[in-house]
């Protein structure tokens, strides 16, 4: 497909959880990775590492751990009962069902990309004590979003997921990610992103209007 207008690509980059088995080219993945690598990071530290999984056996391994993680997570979710209307309830059920589908079929998605970040001291200290300068993953998630928007521009669907962190130890070991000499983890998983051609269509997802969550100059000073 032709390259999309930037705003259209951004506003139609929604979580895709159902994919066809159509192969995804290495060239397209490399394009998305180049876009990811151009994302800004604090102090230009560029902490992320990417693990691209296309091997069917390794995808199956990831699929098993993802499914096990989602099983635990799903059981912990209470069934909401305070929906404002049936449309909101139906939307919640669709998202839940699509997430379940992804958990059961992750191994069938052509490409799985894991975004890793090092476990390192992050912050600064002066004579007054520690300074809160934000979290290291704030320098990783812009790369994830760049990747997803680039994929959208190529007609590929993605979803930013994190539930795999429940079984991060097993997944990192399966991928051969090095640990520290004492056996403690050297990296953690910031995100697992499936990549493939979507079942269905892209579109603008329902969201709160920006005006509802925007305050100008002072809190609650909103514009209609």
Predicted regions and their residues:
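Short, hinge-like loop/turn segments at secondary-structure boundaries
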Residues: 68-69, 175-179
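Short, surface-exposed beta-edge/turn micro-motifs
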Residues: 47-48, 109-112, 189-190
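Glycine-rich phosphate/pyrophosphate-binding beta-alpha loops
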Residues: 39-44
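Short catalytic-loop micro-motif centered on adjacent basic/acidic residues
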Residues: 18-19, 49, 157-162
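Glycine/small-residue-rich phosphate/adenosyl-binding loop
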Residues: 52-140
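C-terminal helix-cap and adjacent tail motif
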Residues: 12, 181-224
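Small-aliphatic-rich amphipathic alpha-helix that forms the alpha element of a beta-alpha
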Residues: 32-37, 113-174
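Generic N-terminal amphipathic, Lys/Arg-enriched alpha-helix
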Residues: 5-22
